[in-house]
Amino acid sequence: MESRLRYRFSGPRKILRGADIQPGQTVLEVGCGTGFHTVSAAQLIGDQGCLVAMDVLSDYVERVSKKVQAAELKNVRVVRRDAMDTGLDTESIDTVLLFSVIPSPTLPLNRFLPEMHRVLKPEGTLAVTTFPWVLRSIRRSGLFAFISKRNGVSNFRRS
């Protein structure tokens, strides 16, 4: 959901700074939704980077595609895909953005986290905003190690 209030208190750039994405990175945004973070993330990684904005809902994919076109971004690929089967190459992603995506009944962690682990590069980062009990589940999975928390974003390194 996009609103002036959300931008004021939790703007996309502030959240993205917490994820520490860098120019030139390949970033996967899971559950891009309305594209609240998409344009800012693409701008932060620059022309040498690549952002894969993924959502399972075609309405969101269409909406984000229009935002990307309007912003004239060439470094974004918007895809309609289930995040438990991304279709991405193994170890191809520097950072996965999971902003208010989990928990979800359509993304059981025992199936979802292994796919995120598979696509992340060996030193890749999983950047998450969610509830504390979900963060504990990520730690307990053994697939990711907690490294930092900044601007409400918990960052995990691929184990």
Where are these predicted regions, by residue range?
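Conserved alpha-helix/loop element of class I SAM-dependent methyltransferases that forms part
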Residues: 6-23
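Conserved SAM/SAH-binding beta-strand->alpha-helix loop
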Residues: 57
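A short SAM/SAH-binding and catalytic strip from SAM-dependent methyltransferases
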Residues: 94-108
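A short glycine-rich, Lys/Arg-flanked "PGG" loop and its adjoining helix->strand segment in the class I
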Residues: 110-122
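Conserved beta-strand signature within the Rossmann-like core of class I S-adenosyl-L-methionine
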Residues: 123-130
